[in-house]
Amino acid sequence: MSDYGLLIDMDGVIYRGNEVIPGAREFINALVDNKIPFLFLTNNSQRTRLDIATKIQRMGMRVTRDHIYTCAISTAHFLARQGKDVTAFVLGEGGLMSALNRNDIAIVDKDPDYVVVGEGRSYTFEMLEQATNLIINGAKLVATNMDPNCPTANGGTRPGCGSIVRLLEEATGRKAFDLGKPSPLMMRDARKLIGLEAAHTFMIGDTMETDILGGLQLGYHCILVLSGGTRRTDIDNYAYKPDTIIDSLADLNIEILEQLMAKKPHHHPALPSC
């Protein structure tokens, strides 16, 4: 097995909507063939790992659900570490509910330890009102992610999980704890899940604010792809920079990954004394 591995965003990196991005199929299958460990990371809490893996398989990539790590799973793992008999009131759908159930988090309507917010299309004002009062009365607010919006299948945009969380923050005066990208908890747990050291980890994504920021904060080698939401001219607007920039996964292969890893320092230089 390789001594390095990858964390890979999906939308804008391997596909756009239901269309595979050129080069992605060949790159992902090469990782599988060469037994290079990798996980797909997503801030989509609606869909289960099986749902996501099935979509990717239909695009010709030989992956399984074990290659998928969602913000819903990150959230469920965090809650499970908080002790026994943890309870949650949930604003969310199938993927989030499944992850919580698999980690023995009891879903309740009264006196929860946490209010957990994920994406959803079935919110009602009454549900938001109930969540507001539960938080005011002591439940802790947890966000599966803070993405402000989400793309729709017809090319439009709808409010994302972060928009709902902001509403609850404003209504209650409480701040949410975010467990999606770029949360270090999610991105560190994903790395550990496939047995990688930080210095041997690539993060590939198309979004500066989540994929690249989160990876840089943990010392990963960050590769920005320009096949999604970021243009080359956008990069100068940020105080931080990716380690590598490519147009798409068509510009990346195993040989290039090994060259990049060979050039990456495996320790940070000592800081000058003040």
Segments the model singles out, each with a brief description of its role:
Residues M1-M10, Y15-N34, S45-Y69, A76, ...:
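Asp-based, Mg2+/Mn2+-dependent phosphohydrolase catalytic module
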